[in-house]
A protein has these predicted regions:
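ATP-binding N-terminal substructure of ATP-dependent carboxylate-amine bond-forming enzymes
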Residues: 1-79
């Protein structure tokens, strides 16, 4: 399973790290991620601003994740 995690803070790092521990998850795409997520196995950072909803939609369409987890409040409020 591919998972998309939106955000770049400590909360999103913890979520992505835990998701990556599942044997069902083969890749976690983190947008934008941080230096810590860049070092984790099975995690891949993508430089997309969490407030740029059209870019996030393009990323989701390109990556086709089976699950998306939104960490920060800004993209939740933006839709």
């Amino acid at each position: 399973m591919k998972v998309l995690v939106i955000g770049g803070g400590g909360r999103e790092h913890a979520l992505a790290w835990k998701l990556a521990q599942s044997p069902r998850v083969h890749e976690v795409v983190v947008a934008p991620g941080n230096a810590g997520t860049a070092r984790e196995p099975k995690l891949r950072n993508v430089p997309v601003d969490v407030a740029d909803v059209p870019a996030l939609l393009d990323l989701a369409r390109a990556e086709q994740p089976e699950l998306t987890v939104v960490g920060p409040e800004v993209p939740l409020v933006a839709g």
